[in-house]
Amino acid sequence: MVKAKYLLALAESGTVTAAAERLGITQPALSRQLRRFEEELDLELFARAGSTLVLTDAARALLPTCRRLLAEAARAGRAVEVLRAGTAPALRVAATPTTISTLLAPFIEEAGSAIPLLTSIPTSHYEVFDALEGAADMVIAPIPPGREVASLPLGSVPVRAWVPPTHPLAVERGGSTTVEAERLLQERLALPSRSSVSRGVIDSFIGSAGLSLGPHVECDDTATLCALARAGRAVALMTELQPGRLVGFDIVAGGESIGGVPLVAAWRPGHFAGEEIAQIAGRFRSFIEGSLR
């Protein structure tokens, strides 16, 4: 386990000197441990490139396994802590930055001491499940889970158009809660980038309606999208549920409404706090349902 940690340190630090400093050991000691690791595995893990030690293809192939071993060791240590204390420690939840700021953080605040202490790990939309191989105890994902994880559907969060109450779009709607996509596309839009699931929902809906995007800017930070809308610089299309000082509209075209972003909670089967995580996921689903009313 220690040698796996040393190999990862070298891979992530780039040089033996930097890895040794990171690990708090001397460079000769690290070099000896790495050579011993090679001998134990009977594999060539390192090659010289001038004065630099670089990883071979065999070493790089071992890195995912090393990461899993260290993550499992950390989880085992935390499980022991739980058994000693009799209660779950702080649990780590991986999710996209938007999900964290608009849903998870408000949920943590509202739930208070009724749930175990939760902390968040920001991750990208399409790599969220990878966090379960690392430090995350639970993930909130906008993409479907695989069969290898335990999961609970949380519902769908709608993509809506948001403007300040004084915006011409809000004034002309006269209290209506919907806006035609064709009319919406006459405005400058502020959209999430194509690295987000919500942008895929937007593009698919507009394309299916036979329309195309006009002037727009892209940003993956929800606070900035809200700021652009409040400043009257653009109409924000986003999954924020209840942004202050903005009014929202459901987007329609040809009698069809734009879809939402489906969310799912997932965790590893057999997790030491699996029962608590399932209960948290259920409460989180109820929180989302209540926020959408």
Label every model-predicted segment.
Residues 124-128, 135, 142, 195-252:
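Hydrophobic hinge/microswitch elements
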Residues 38-55:
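A short LG(V/I)-centered, amphipathic sequence patch enriched
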Residues 251-293:
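A late-sequence structural motif
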Residues 88-146:
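Central regulatory/effector-binding core of bacterial HTH transcription factors
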